[in-house]
From Swiss-Prot:
Pfam families hit by this protein: Guanylate_kin
Keywords per UniProt: ATP-binding, Cytoplasm, Kinase, Nucleotide-binding, Transferase
Residues the record lists as binding ATP: 11-18
Single GO term (MF): ATP binding
Protein name according to UniProt: Guanylate kinase
Domain of life (superkingdom): Bacteria
Encoding gene, per UniProt annotation: gmk
Catalysed reaction equations from the record: GMP + ATP = GDP + ADP
GO CC entries: cytosol
Residue ranges of domain Guanylate kinase-like in the record: 4-185
């Protein structure tokens, strides 16, 4: 059975990451793909489904999982809630040949690289700061103050782009989607990947 690849996908708010992930999962059925579902201690919001949006657990359960070293990465955010990525769930899906995407920020990415050096990371850039602000305003969800905060945070996040393996400018949605698909395909053609997937064939070809 093929081994799946683990990917980190990061971007500032408004860069189009969520839409790109949804489109990527719906495309190219030749490879299985999924977004990792995180654990959190915060209460479910209206419309959120257990196991689809998050795994909702108590603070005590979460801290027990931390003690057992069962998180690939985790963080305690403003307000006191925990968020984390389950290591056993990731390993199980990768073993099934599923490419797993982690929708996390640069801080989570740094944690994961220490535990899984083979992870591939992708950063999505906006075409410009004015365009990023226009997209945030166009959502119609946030006040001017919140948008200003998001823009400030975006500039901080963008400063970490050079820590990533791949960088894509999302100035054309369809082109960016194709770029993402190309990354997935190319990662399955690397020497390291093929040595694992076709070990027996390579051994036979090299046998005297």
């Amino acid at each position: 059975m093929s081994q799946g690849n683990l990917y980190i996908l990061s971007a500032p708010s408004g860069a189009g990451k969520s839409s790109l992930i949804s489109a990527l999962l719906a495309s190219d059925s030749s490879t299985q793909k999924m977004v990792s579902v995180s654990h959190t201690t915060r209460a479910p919001r209206p419309g959120e489904v257990e196991g689809v949006h998050y795994y909702f657990v108590s603070k005590e359960e979460f801290e027990s999982l931390i003690e057992q070293d069962l998180f690939l990465e985790y963080a305690k955010v403003f307000g006191g809630n925990y968020y984390g990525t389950s290591l056993p769930a990731i390993e199980e899906n990768l073993a099934k040949g599923i490419d797993v995407f982690l929708d996390i920020d640069w801080q989570g990415a740094q944690q994961i690289r220490k535990k899984v050096p083979s992870v591939k990371s992708i950063f999505i850039l906006p075409p410009s700061l004015p365009e990023l602000e226009r997209r945030l305003i166009g959502r119609g969800q946030d006040s001017e103050e919140v948008i200003a905060e998001r823009m400030s945070k975006a500039m901080s996040e963008i400063s970490h782009y050079d820590e990533y393996d791949y960088v894509i400018v999302n100035d054309d949605f369809e082109k960016t989607l194709k770029d993402l698909q190309s990354i997935l395909q190319s990662e399955r053609l690397t020497k390291d990947y093929q040595q694992k997937q076709n070990a027996m064939l390579i051994q036979q070809l090299l046998a005297k």
